[in-house]
Amino acid sequence: MAGVLTANTAEAQAMHSLRELMFGKHTDSSHDGSHMPIVAHFVSARGEGFVLDESQAAPLLRFDGDDEVFQLTAKPGANGDITFRNDVGEPVLKATRLGGMILFSGAHEDVGDPAAVTGQAPAFTPDRLTLTELWLEMAKSQLRVSHACNHRIDINANKDNIDEGIPNETIINLFAESVSVTTDALIQVASQADSRHALDKLHEVDLIEGRPPSAHIENGVLIVKLDPSRGAWGGHPSSKRIMNVVMTGLDDETRR
């Protein structure tokens, strides 16, 4: 228990330190020139834009032009820097002790690219879907994945065993986000000549309740575990994590 408390305290301190390093005291107003917004848009030196949302329980990031929202984990370094990692343990952002921000992405993920705030951005909010709309999205996604893979792949969702205390809207949002992320991951694998063979034996995707959020393949079925208690973005594995599972057969639980 002491170890858990220590880890949680360190992460909370990291988030507090990040805000102080970069922005001083956060404000929801963009009219105060001495403070930066708690939800901010950044652009890297090479022109890659993204939004960092610190208004939630955990930091969230979305790249411009991408629908996926990534939940990050903040880890303080010995030199006072704070590194944000994704759910496969890779660094995505670094806040330096001098107040700078470095983005690790794409061709520059090893050396990083300095980024600057360009202004305030709206906080991330999940789409409001009904259960019927969720099933329609699943049907559309199943067609897209099957077409990309050149064979039928069913997408199923089982939400029967989820804690009754969790709002139905939260559950639907989580399943909808997971369907979208999983679909994008499989289509991306299928688009790569050197990896699409990994989908040859895949015939089904099952979305189920489980902790921690993870993914694995069993007898041609991609099983994606979702944790509604972590919300719409933290409760499912990212597209990158799912791609790694499909291509290697292994799930990296570095963060979870």
Model regions: which residues?
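Bacterial N-terminal signal peptides
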Residues: M1-V4
